[in-house]
Regions:
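Short intrinsically disordered terminal tails
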Residues: 1-2, 59-62
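Extended rod-forming repeat segments used as scaffolds/tethers
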Residues: 27, 57-60
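Short N-terminal "domain-start" leader segments
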Residues: 1-31
C-alpha cells in the first residue's frame, strides 16, 4: 500500500490517503493505523482530487 498523502488535524490525528485495491480501487482517507473495515473514520472517493480536498478540510477544521 502506497500512501499518497498524510495530514494532521487539530486533534493531532494523522490521516492517510491511499488507493484501496480491495474497494474498487477507490481512494481511501482514514485515520493512520485504523484497520477496522467498518470504521466510521474511513472515507472513499472516486478521484484523488476529491480525497485531497477532503483531507484539506480535515486539516483546516477545528
Amino acid at each position: 500500500m502506497e500512501i499518497i498523502k498524510r495530514v494532521t488535524d487539530s486533534r493531532k490525528r494523522t490521516w492517510e490517503c491511499f488507493v484501496d485495491r480491495c474497494y474498487f480501487d477507490m481512494y481511501c482517507v482514514r485515520v493512520e493505523g485504523d484497520r477496522n473495515f467498518n470504521s466510521q473514520l474511513s472515507f472513499h472517493f472516486y478521484t484523488v482530487n476529491e480525497a485531497i480536498d477532503f483531507m484539506n478540510l480535515l486539516k483546516e477544521s477545528h
